[in-house]
């Protein structure tokens, strides 16, 4: 077989690449520790706050406290939070790992930090194994794995896009696609034999790979299936044979089946209650907003170590936010050079140019196939590319096609690893009979590439640990005081009202900032976080009422406290709101940084319930919870 190196006959040799990959993973973690200056970090404090980072802190806390991300009775009280409308199940393996860290780390901050660091190890591990399987040397595979794990994409996604940081299955998907170019084909017997080859170690590994691909993120699953479809189709047409297409169909079918199993809670929710039209609705036009900008592959990464390159990267984004797509598409210096060389070499080969062969046929074929994969990714993912047609055909949940840059990055790593081996081969011929010098030369080349990758691909990513510590202590102390005042099980009403999920910031409050109460104090119940479009958005309806009216309603529902985020109001509105609440509930307690105000409603609630009586209280609560300014989507 052209793509795969032969399997060693000795069992211990089969473990050698695994042990090598483990060493590379540990070395990558050590480099990340230096880059992020982890000796300064406090593990329980999340290193990124705001935006989607708070969403994943919320998910980590839900996993640790309730064992599932799907239902959280502590949020969206009294309805509870139901996340089936967000198909996170496609990341079930990642969520399982996050739950493990939530239990071991005893807190969401530690869980998210540990998960993020673990992704560097898992990406390096799988990359090394795949490169070795493709026939690259031990040293070339180790260098390539480090470069790939240290990609700018990894740091820029970071904890804000936590699950996207786990792109360890991208190399596996790449390998499955390449395996379709040669015999023996996955899940099929060798030529001359009949039937399906179900009972073999290779079949089990292919099936496991397809299952894992369907469980580690919808984007990486779709990208991998796209490559598999491309490879199978090209090989079937080239060989005029049904076999590559059949193998392709079996892999894709198994992956799609497992993907459906993973997202079955979301599918069942839609079947039973109808589609929630208020959440997760995408349009083909969004592929133009979040598509791949091919020029971004070749420029320096954002927040580069060198000020001049950082400025150049910033200018390349342009002044119009609508056309900036997402950050993190850059390949880095080594990847940009590799992709340029690969594209030129492929063009010369396609044009039939005669030149002295620099690579042997096996290596040249591998690089050409990797280049085809990269070109296909660019054609599909680019703004104005085929992704618009894919979305128009129905695959609308995959809108940020710029993320396919991480697949392109691995194709360049394949080219780099093959090039590394070719250079060391040339050196070995010149240093024949001098093994010590040869080893030193190869080690020097590897070290140089690693140093360049470390300096170029890792930018100004060190978290501001001092500021993080101050903010964490202020927030933790404030919410702990709320818990101490009200006691476990009490219900707290969040102000201002922030719909959930995927909404624009309100003044200075992010989409998930109000989840912090649950993140810090999960024994309390919080009004924030019920799924819009499924439950009546009574807090929004209450906003239009005078303070005596809406405060009577929330007291009847069972809330005994209010936490007001001052960043969610203009100065005038904040002063008016606090004055109205204080007139009925007394003055607030504020956080050390002045952002949060807490109003104790226990005395007010007791007086209100006594005035209304049991029947009146129940009627008022039912009336308030039925209020809505939107029509639920099911």
What are these regions (language model features)?
Residues 263-347, 517, 604-606:
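Periplasmic/ER-lumenal interhelical loops and adjacent helix-loop junctions
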Residues 27-31, 114-134, 138-237, 255, ...:
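Membrane-embedded helix bundles of polyisoprenyl
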Residues 229, 249-257, 419-457:
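Signature aromatic-anchored transmembrane alpha helix within multi-pass, membrane-resident enzymes
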Residues 275, 283, 288-290, 436, ...:
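Extracytoplasmic
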Residues 31-123, 151-167, 291, 299-326, ...:
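Membrane-interface coil-to-helix junctions
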Residues 17-51, 58, 252-270, 379, ...:
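Transmembrane signal-anchor helices characteristic of membrane glycosylation enzymes that use polyprenol
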Residues 1-39, 236, 247-254, 347-373, ...:
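Start-transfer (signal-anchor) and selected internal transmembrane alpha helices
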Residues 157-165, 278-282, 286, 312-334, ...:
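Membrane-helix boundary/interfacial segments in multi-pass membrane proteins
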